[in-house]
Amino acid sequence: MPKKKPTPIQLNPAPDGSAVNGTSSAETNLEALQKKLEELELDEQQRKRLEAFLTQKQKVGELKDDDFEKISELGAGNGGVVFKVSHKPSGLVMARKLIHLEIKPAIRNQIIRELQVLHECNSPYIVGFYGAFYSDGEISICMEHMDGGSLDQVLKKAGRIPEQILGKVSIAVIKGLTYLREKHKIMHRDVKPSNILVNSRGEIKLCDFGVSGQLIDSMANSFVGTRSYMSPERLQGTHYSVQSDIWSMGLSLVEMAVGRYPIPPPDAKELELMFGCQVEGDAAETPPRPRTPGRPLSSSSQTTQWSIQPGISRFCE
């Protein structure tokens, strides 16, 4: 039986005279956007939800600091604080991330330009993006509000997350990473429970992926991501690949399954291996403990262990 052709997503042009999130070419790009969306494999519910979000987004217009009313703080981390806000002109509730940066105007403008790539990242597994702007020393990134919060918040309340739910989390994260990789040549670079968001409709989406190289450099001198979720090759400062995102995803899933971070703190010898420098203190003083699953058996096995991490395409088969 032939596969049913999905219903195309219908997007109406924004009202005359309005700029969509500060980009005057938004209406010109509408046809191209529709074509890209039709390439995605969406079920009917996903299609309708994405269509509704993009239709709302067209009504937002240019984002300005005075147009927001703070409702509550959602969380802080990765160089910024996130607030639940009301966008008064449209009436939409958004999540607004504020990143304080003391940078030159040229760098600031480059960051805003690079963040515009997020306008093209439209997927059921990626948190929606309304726009970004600079005001009073802070970069504002305005996103879809996910009312269920992040999975690290869910984990704190629940203690651990059931296997059945983790299966759905795995599928959503893999599909989100695959979309970023295949459609936009983007690697996430910071997969962890706090960057996986959920909402009351049961959707699971990724946020805070590294699209702006200049923002990454400005925030952390080219060292981005949470160390405890980084793959071994990242800790050593070597190449970054999609396998590094897979490592971080796996570590996050184990943490959510057992209810705690799965790897004990490294001893002095392990720190020396990871960072290539001597650590003060006697490594022999550290009491022996069982090897955590996933850790190398010995230093000689490191290169082989780390180099065989599976590519993301294998998980989608």
At which residue positions do the language-model features occur?
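Intrinsically disordered, low-complexity regulatory segments that flank or precede the catalytic domain
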Residues: 1-61
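Activation-segment/catalytic-loop signature of the eukaryotic protein kinase fold
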Residues: 132
